[in-house]
Amino acid sequence: MFPTDPVSNLAALIRCPSVTPAEGGALAALEAMLAPVGFKVDRVVAKEPGTPDIENLYARTGGEGPHLMFAGHTDVVPVGDEAAWSRPPFSAAIAEGEMYGRGAVDMKGGIACFVAAVARHIEKHGAPKGSISFLITGDEEGPAINGTVKLLEWAAARGERWDACLVGEPTNPDCIGDMIKIGRRGSLSGRITVHGVQGHAAYPHLADNPVRSILQIAQALMDPPFDDGTENFQPSNLEVTTIDVGNTAVNVIPAKASAAFNIRFNDRWTAESLMAEIVARLDRAAAGSALRPGRAPARYEIVWNERPSHVFLTRNNALIDSLSGAVEAVTGRQPQLSTTGGTSDARFIKDYCPVVEFGLVGKTMHMVDERVALADLETLTGIYETFIARWFGHAAA
């Protein structure tokens, strides 16, 4: 039986407790949907010392011609306090036209809809005029070490090549059809430690308080603004996310203080140029402090996150036009082409082929009582089905 009903597909996926890193039966359920449609399915276990093994899935159907990939994840975030849920988080309960469950929106719902869309397309038109593949990880909500990155490497090593990719993350703020993500800002994180001299709070002249310096350094990182945005991206923004001293004694000046930060940056910067700008700001703040009269520059060190995410923008007109045209045909809305929000696994896929993102409404993702309207599942399936037909029509032209 073809899995043409997104509601049934989603219920089967939600009932699998696939909290990262557990597979929870979700990939097995997905494989059971794809096999009857003619997909060859591979389950790929990725490993890395010091991290949990992660099971992933790659499936492909079709033959020669353009190759369209759908990417996503079956892993979900923890449910939190289960007693706070109005319905069990892995029950796929339906009430008042909505299905409840962890992953309903992020992003088992998107997977369920694309499976249904592909099944409907093949049922109506036969095999695609090319190939369709699913690249599904169990490690998106976690550290993302043994997930999409390694699955892409595995598939590419086998000779897989893709012409375009659609990621089914929830991209719409309010209604299906609001927004398509055509790129993402970069993300860079670091931790700064300022070293001082420990001493008695009553004798500050005998000590060197690093808290004074870390506060000034934190301010220098955030102000002035890094830029005022670009044509396709909002202004780069740095947030200091924590300041830590680890000192419980109120009469002791600490020996060191640290601060962590994250910056989301636009295409005016690379990770490397941004690092240089941040270090220049740190040097100026450390050297010229009115809070440190008569003292040497503050001594600091910075440790960068090992894996910055690079900014990217997709300019593939056939892909974007096929998707935006499908959205408008089904919903009547002209979607906004956006680069807002956080990072996703599209940041890895962009190194292999053009990629865009479109899925459900994200209002309840990661929340207690995460849920999706059944009508939205049908609408998204219709958009995906229309997109498949339009994209293969463009690609074959």
UniProtKB/Swiss-Prot annotation:
Keywords of the record: Amino-acid biosynthesis, Cobalt, Diaminopimelate biosynthesis, Hydrolase, Lysine biosynthesis, Metal-binding, Zinc
Domain of life: Bacteria
Entry EC number(s): 3.5.1.18
Protein name (record): Succinyl-diaminopimelate desuccinylase
Pfam families: M20_dimer (PF07687), Peptidase_M20 (PF01546)
Gene3D superfamilies on file: Zn peptidases
UniProt keyword Transmembrane present: no
Native organism: Rhizobium meliloti (strain 1021) (Ensifer meliloti)
